[in-house]
Regions:
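C-terminal hydrophobic helical "lid"/dimerization subdomain
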Residues: 1-3, 250-254, 296-351
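N-terminal glycine-rich cofactor-binding segment
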Residues: 3-21, 38-69, 87, 102-117
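Glycine-rich beta-strand-centered segment in the early N-terminal region that forms part
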Residues: 20-34, 48-98, 140
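Short, well-ordered loop/turn sites that connect or cap secondary structure elements
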Residues: 77-80, 166, 256
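NAD(P)H dinucleotide-binding glycine-rich loop of Rossmann-like/cofactor-binding domains
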Residues: 94-175
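Mid-domain Rossmann-like dinucleotide-binding core that forms the NAD(H)/NADP(H) cofactor-binding site
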Residues: 141-220
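Short amphipathic alpha-helix with an adjacent loop that forms part of the alpha/beta core around
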Residues: 222-232
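Glycine-rich phosphate-binding loop and adjacent beta-alpha segment
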Residues: 245-308, 345-351
Length: 351
């Protein structure tokens, strides 16, 4: 099979390797699409090395089909039957640490991830070991594989929004109009909220299409003024920081209303710091919260939302590349040529 593996930090190699050997309690999936994110690019270029196993096959946003199951597994009981279209949650949690037993398996102390510590989706096939069978999530009805691959980023956004008071007529400010910010716009609009998106001019039209009623490129005091005007001087009920810029933190806090919530969704550079006015947090009684990864329940909900058509993210996938041209796919991510870039096994592009 063809696979894109990390030979060493910054060296991504496209190679032919044997199809993984199926153990008695493993499952083998045929990959149908893997969408890329900034993390994949940082790993491929050597900027991210923590938690990355040398030689690992990259790709953690995965849509696939069950190909074979081990002799000791029962189809439809232990794992979906061969031929079933599935999403694959990337988080393999231990189930035993304090985080796992308290319901936060998304921040498991011994987390392993498909695409960083375990071979991921930039290959023709992916082996799912026994301890990760619960990550295999069948669809309610079949959908385009690149769309199904978006269940992973959707599940992470869903994890955050489930912890925020977003409902009908809530005012939600989304900072950042990359794919993650756009998904947050769609989720907030789905919940009935009114959404303002702030980001680069080129991404404002997609933000409007995905649920933002108003958009802005303003920064700093200009953004605060925009939010005040939009909310009648009250401020946003919820502010979601969807891009890893520490400079947005003080502005986000200024934009929140009394009793408002600020979600630190984006990951920030290692060692990053932000200056916060503690009196704003104190006197406005603000709630600041973080969110990372997703639980299996979040992922299952995301697959269900996509496969039932409850939420439409189809416009996010703007480019498809064959696996044999994965270097061009990563270049498209680097140059921001589109929104989400999908990589598919050779012969499947456009199908």
């Amino acid at each position: 099979m063809l696979a894109a593996s990390l030979r060493s930090p910054g060296t991504l190699t496209l190679e032919k390797r044997p199809i993984p050997v199926l153990g008695p309690r493993d499952a083998l999936l045929a990959v149908e699409a893997t969408t890329l994110c900034g993390t994949d690019l940082r790993i491929a270029t050597g900027q991210k090395t923590n938690g990355v196993t040398p030689g690992v096959v990259l790709g953690h946003e995965i849509a696939a089909r069950v190909w074979r199951i081990g002799d000791e597994l029962t189809a439809g009981v232990d794992v979906p039957a061969p031929g079933t279209q599935v999403g694959l949650a990337p988080e393999i949690a231990c189930g035993q640490c304090n985080a796992c037993v308290s319901g936060r398996s998304n921040v498991c102390a011994r987390m392993r991830l498909f695409g960083t510590g375990v071979d991921g989706g930039l290959a023709d096939f992916i082996l799912v070991p026994q301890e990760a069978l619960a990550c295999i999530t069948p669809v309610a009805r079949e959908i385009a594989p690149p769309l199904l691959a978006l269940a992973e980023p959707l599940s992470c956004c869903l994890r955050a929004t489930r912890r925020l008071p977003i409902g009908p007529d809530s005012r939600v400010l989304v900072l950042g109009t990359g794919p993650i910010g756009l998904i947050h716009c769609a989720l907030a609009a789905f919940a009935g909220a009114r959404v303002m998106a702030c980001g680069r001019a080129a991404r404002l039209e997609p933000a409007r299409t995905m649920g933002a009623e108003t958009t802005t490129t303003s920064q700093g005091d200009g953004l605060v003024a925009n939010v005040q005007e939009w909310t009648g001087g009250v401020g946003a009920d919820v502010v979601i920081i969807a891009v890893g810029d520490p400079g947005l933190v003080p502005v986000a806090i200024q934009c929140a209303r009394i009793g408002g919530h600020v979600s630190f969704f984006a990951g920030f550079p290692a060692g990053a710091t932000a200056q916060v006015d503690p009196n704003l947090v104190h006197y406005r009684e603000l709630t600041l919260s973080g969110s990372a990864n997703a639980t299996l329940d979040d992922y299952a909900s995301a697959v269900d939302m996509l496969s039932t058509g409850s939420i439409d993210l189809s416009q996010l996938v703007t480019h498809e590349f064959a696996l044999s041209d994965v270097s061009s796919a990563l270049d498209a991510v680097r140059t921001r040529a589109g929104l989400k870039i999908a990589v598919r096994p050779d012969g499947m592009v456009g199908r």
